[in-house]
Amino acid sequence: MAFFPTLFILKEERQYSNMRIWAKEILDNRLIKDMVVTDNSDETRTHKVFNALDEVCHAFDLGKPIWLDSNITDFQVHSKTRFTKDSFIEEIPFDYLEFHVIEED
């Protein structure tokens, strides 16, 4: 009788030591506000992304946007997403908030 070991493949999230995220408010194809958030903590990539979004929303005086399925897919594929008015509960004074990972080490 042959023995075949069972392999378990667990999806581990890679730890990044340095991450920079660029957030931009865009109105009529023009940059209104922008900011770069740098995170050198030992958190996971997901935690760093959420912490950066919290920091951006606080700095721009915005409510936190809702991550729609399209935002999640765009961010997973391109490391970039756009939060439009559909992602915010309150009215926003711009067309969209672009959130883009510009550096990961």
Where are these regions (language model features)?
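Short, Lys/Arg-enriched N-terminal segments with co-localized hydrophobic residues
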Residues: 3-18
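Compositionally biased non-globular segments, especially hydrophobic aliphatic-rich helices
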Residues: 5-9, 26, 55
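Intrinsically disordered, low-complexity boundary segments flanking structured domains
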Residues: 8, 21-22, 83-88
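Non-catalytic effector/regulatory segments
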Residues: 9-12, 28-30, 60
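Short, surface-exposed loop and linker segments with low hydrophobicity and enrichment for Pro/Ser/Thr
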Residues: 14-16, 47, 90-93
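Short, extreme N-terminal segment that most often corresponds to the first beta-strand
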Residues: 16-36
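Short, flexible N-terminal segments of the mature chain
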Residues: 31-59
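Acidic, low-complexity intrinsically disordered segments
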Residues: 52-105
